[in-house]
């Protein structure tokens, strides 16, 4: 028997499994108050998924408002769409716009790594499609458990194959990201996928419905049982030792070839002016798409749910309405354009069905074979869900953690000890080559990738006639954020900003994905609140806006949470990609190596402390956002005037790691001369922020120095590139061959996962 609105009104006391669906008692009672009766089974399913943590942001919303409060009108200049849309959109000049966003698919990627990661890519790509853009590239931020943990191989193998399999099939280059191993992610991997798309500004589309009588068309794949309760429920729960594998049926199944056709179909529909509003079907499926479209447009909607094409027999209305089957879109189309819309879909062999229409008023009415199974105000579903001011409390352990400095750890002193330290860090899972992973992705498909592997940021050509392009980088540091959430978020922002700047691009906008433990833990909420404020204040200092993002809570097993991991993505613009700066040394004979920025004795939270002593404590490096802004301006000017031939950001592993990576990328040796009054260990391995290694063509050294001095940016000569050498020499300390460095650097991941 179908539970209709009429039947629900006459059976107020019928027991309902609201708790099993994730609703609290008070939330369930609020639904009853809104409706003036008990909800039908379909309504209950809809409210449960739409009021879940993943869909409603009910624990984070009060803190996320700070992004809006700190965004000035000056920062909004050039932002065409921001927080609240499927993805942020920014003006990059010459009539072009870029849309980009990062989202999590963490929990599904643990339950079923291949499909979890693959559909994570598919979902973020559809968000970009829904803005009217052509997706042009993807990136990923991955966090796995310890490299030697038994389950890490299963998860990593599936996740990497899923990302590569879906992205490669779509013909989208993977232009960068990060892979981090830490035992805190055992059982709780992070899979954060970013997609970037390009559009002409006049082609921008938004997610709203308007115009009574306009038709609602569902197009794409058929609706099945896969993903019932999927991401919206999984991402709102923690894992226990036994429960993870039981959740397998809730993970969606992706078809990248269907999505590839869907991309081309959407672009032709946009070009024909056939779309009024559009929404992709992701978490919560059709229940989300219809309620959000109606709510955003302040209209009603009538949907005949039984007309939805299904690939499983005997599906209930609730299952059809809340299915998270992939590769589906929902469009608002004028009646006179329906035939043309359907004709385009037939051309691309995309299934399309008129399932309803926009109505006057404020009711979302869903019928099943003529009987009403949903009759609700859409705003109460999509935008007026519960909002919680969760208890926030600085953990009692925080003071002791910050007092536990790394200064007492034994440090290398002799040249042999420094050499051994370099090789130990380089040969650890933390700093080793990621080529074993990235070589499974296509980085250059479509022919517009200018920088990818070995680069601090991915660079894409947008306009072939002018050379206009973009740079993208994503960064995060859970270790720094654990020590100080406010500073940790700013350090992630600073590094992503710096990574974009070292290509010569001007940073213009930010996206984020905030990965934390349970919001029911006051200590986790303190970390979250501090990180949000740090990121928002940092963006205000740099004068670049947050255009959108994602929150992923409940990343913990039992009472043990992951390190707080705010992932920050920064978008930059290059007026001509021909002037981009790469990381490889040796493109000019006799390049001068210079270190920009100040180096301090800062090792708390460093990779050195982790690898050599398993230590995490103290305070993270200082962050100076004014210095970061100055660095970006200098690098942009140096790129434009061709004063710098290579540049590499300093972060984990410090100067030593940056030198090795740039030397290996250029397959050339170099000679390093550290200041005589400096501690070689500090100079080589400190992780002080705001620093960049640059290679300057010998004839330009004087001009470059003068530019840095005029702007007040410290610039120290630390060596030269030696194209006739096959080793790195640190004068008075040690020499190590490129062959030994490469073998150490590249052997680690194949040893664990090959």
UniProtKB/Swiss-Prot annotation:
Its EC number is 6.3.5.3. Keywords: ATP-binding, Cytoplasm, Ligase, Magnesium, Metal-binding, Nucleotide-binding, Purine biosynthesis. The keyword Transit peptide does not apply. Its main location: cytoplasm. InterPro entries: PRibForGlyAmidine_synth_PurL, PurL_linker, PurM-like_C_dom, PurM-like_C_sf, PurM-like_N, PurM-like_N_sf. Mg(2+) 1 binds at residues 103, 550. It holds the Pfam family AIRS_C. Substrate binds at residues 104-107, 126, 252, 324-326, 552. Monomer. Part of the FGAM synthase complex composed of 1 PurL, 1 PurQ and 2 PurS subunits. This is Phosphoribosylformylglycinamidine synthase subunit PurL. It comes from Mycobacterium leprae (strain TN). The gene is purL.
């Amino acid at each position: 028997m179908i539970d209709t609105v009429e039947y629900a009104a006459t059976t107020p006391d019928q027991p309902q499994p609201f708790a099993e669906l994730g609703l609290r008692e008070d939330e369930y009672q609020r639904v009853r108050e809104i409706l003036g009766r008990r909800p039908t089974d379909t309504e209950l399913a809809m409210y449960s998924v739409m009021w879940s943590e993943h869909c409603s942001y009910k624990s984070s919303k009060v803190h996320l408002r700070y992004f809006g409060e700190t965004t000035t009108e000056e920062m909004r200049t050039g932002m065409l769409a921001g927080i609240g849309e499927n993805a942020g959109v920014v003006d990059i000049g010459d009539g072009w716009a870029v849309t980009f966003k990062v989202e999590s698919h963490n929990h599904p990627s643990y339950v079923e790594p291949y499909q979890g990661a693959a559909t994570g890519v598919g979902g973020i790509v559809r968000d970009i499609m829904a803005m009217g853009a052509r997706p042009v590239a993807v990136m990923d931020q991955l966090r796995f458990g310890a490299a030697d943990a038994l389950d890490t191989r299963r998860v990593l193998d599936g996740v990497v194959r899923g990302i590569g399999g879906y992205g490669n099939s779509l013909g989208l280059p993977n232009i960068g990201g990060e892979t981090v191993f830490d035992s805190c992610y055992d059982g709780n991997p992070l899979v954060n996928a970013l997609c970037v798309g390009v559009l002409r500004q006049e082609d921008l589309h938004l997610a709203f419905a308007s115009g009574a009588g306009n038709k609602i068309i569902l197009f794409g794949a058929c609706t099945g049982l896969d993903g019932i309760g999927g991401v919206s429920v999984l991402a709102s729960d923690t894992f226990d030792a036994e429960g993870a594998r039981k959740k397998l049926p809730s993970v969606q199944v992706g078809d990248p070839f269907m999505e590839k056709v869907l991309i081309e179909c959407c672009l032709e529909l946009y070009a024909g002016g056939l779309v009024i509003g559009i929404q992709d079907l992701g978490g919560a499926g059709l229940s989300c798409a219809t309620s959000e479209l109606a709510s955003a447009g302040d209209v009603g909607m009538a949907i005949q749910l039984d007309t939805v094409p299904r690939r499983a027999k005997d599906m209930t209305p609730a299952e059809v309405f809340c299915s998270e089957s992939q590769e589906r879109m929902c469009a608002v189309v004028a009646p006179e354009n329906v035939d043309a819309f359907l004709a385009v879909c037939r051309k691309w062999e995309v299934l399309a069905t008129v399932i309803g229409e926009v109505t006057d008023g404020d009711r979302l009415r869903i019928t099943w074979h003529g009987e009403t199974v949903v009759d609700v105000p859409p705003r109460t579903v999509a935008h007026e869900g519960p909002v919680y001011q969760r208890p926030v409390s600085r953990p009692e352990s925080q003071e002791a953690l910050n007092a536990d400095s790394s200064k007492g750890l034994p440090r290398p002193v002799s040249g042999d000890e420094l050499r051994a330290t370099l090789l130990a860090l380089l040969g650890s899972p933390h700093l080793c080559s990621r080529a074993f992973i990235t070589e499974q992705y296509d980085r250059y498909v479509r022919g517009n990738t200018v920088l990818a592997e070995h680069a601090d940021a991915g660079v894409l050509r947008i306009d072939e006639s002018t050379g206009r392009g973009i740079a993208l980088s994503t960064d995060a540091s859970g270790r720094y954020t654990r020590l100080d959430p406010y500073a940790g978020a700013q350090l992630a922002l600073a590094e992503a900003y710096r990574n974009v700047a070292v290509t010569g691009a001007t940073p213009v906008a930010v996206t984020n994905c905030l990965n934390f433990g349970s919001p029911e833990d006051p200590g986790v909420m303190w970390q979250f609140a501090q990180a949000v404020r740090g990121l928002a204040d940092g963006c205000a200092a740099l004068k670049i806006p947050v255009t959108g993002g994602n929150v992923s809570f409940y990343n913990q097993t039992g009472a043990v949470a992951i390190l707080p991991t705010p992932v920050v993505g920064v978008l930059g613009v290059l007026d001509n990609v021909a002037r981009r700066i790469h990381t490889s040394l040796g493109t000019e004979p006799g390049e001068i190596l210079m270190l920009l920025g100040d180096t301090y004795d800062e090792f708390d939270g460093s990779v050195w402390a982790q690898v050599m002593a398993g230590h995490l404590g103290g305070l993270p490096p200082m962050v100076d956002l004014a210095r970061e802004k100055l660095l970006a301006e200098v690098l942009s000017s140096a790129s434009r005037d061709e004063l710098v031939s290579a540049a590499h950001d300093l972060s984990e592993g410090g100067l030593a790691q940056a030198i090795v990576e740039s030397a290996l990328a250029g397959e050339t040796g170099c000679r390093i001369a550290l200041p005589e009054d400096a501690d070689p260990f500090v100079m080589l391995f400190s992780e002080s922020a705001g620093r960049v290694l640059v290679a300057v063509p010998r004839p330009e050294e004087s001009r470059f120095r003068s530019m840095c001095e005029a702007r007040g940016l410290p610039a120290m000569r630390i060596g030269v590139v030696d194209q006739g050498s096959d080793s790195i020499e640190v004068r008075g300390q040690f020499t190590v061959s490129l062959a030994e460095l490469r073998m150490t650097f590249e052997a680690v991941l194949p040893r664990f996962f090959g």
